[in-house]
């Protein structure tokens, strides 16, 4: 996946469901500014360790649900992620990013896709 996205040095990268950091590990070699979020604390620790092993600060990897803490629109050149399929949307989740209709609360897949689009810069790329 990292090869498909063709990250260039100096671009900004975000994985809103970074898990154990597989995409982060893959994209690190392209010298991009890396950010990520993960709600599972154990997976988050693995992501941060992978960043440390590569001499990068893990400070841009945050412990959060994919929609928390990133309220600015169009922040990133690249979004590469494995969606957290079949998550339920928390009842109180803010939906400011839903440009294409309110997603069902029974499944966060549509919300996740809208969030990724919302977070991309105008000429950004996602996979």
Stretches found by the model and what they are:
Residues 97-100, 125-127:
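Short, flexible active-site loops
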Residues 1-81, 86-88, 94-99, 106, ...:
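Conserved S-adenosyl-L-methionine
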Residues 105-127:
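Conserved Class I SAM-dependent methyltransferase catalytic core
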Residues 88-89, 124:
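Short acidic/glycine-rich loop or secondary-structure boundary segments that cap or lie
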């Amino acid at each position: 996946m990292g090869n498909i996205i063709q990250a260039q040095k100096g671009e900004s990268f975000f994985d809103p469901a970074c898990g154990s950091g597989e995409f982060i590990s893959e994209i690190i070699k392209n010298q991009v500014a890396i950010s990520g979020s993960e709600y599972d604390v154990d997976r988050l620790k693995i992501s941060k360790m992978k960043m440390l092993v590569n001499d990068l600060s893990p400070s841009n990897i945050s412990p959060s649900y994919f929609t928390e803490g990133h309220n600015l629109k169009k922040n990133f050149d690249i979004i590469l992620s494995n969606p957290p399929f079949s998550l339920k949307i928390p009842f109180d989740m803010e939906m400011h990013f839903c440009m294409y209709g309110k997603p069902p609360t029974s499944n966060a897949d549509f919300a996740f896709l809208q969030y990724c689009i919302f977070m991309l810069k105008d000429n950004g790329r996602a996979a």
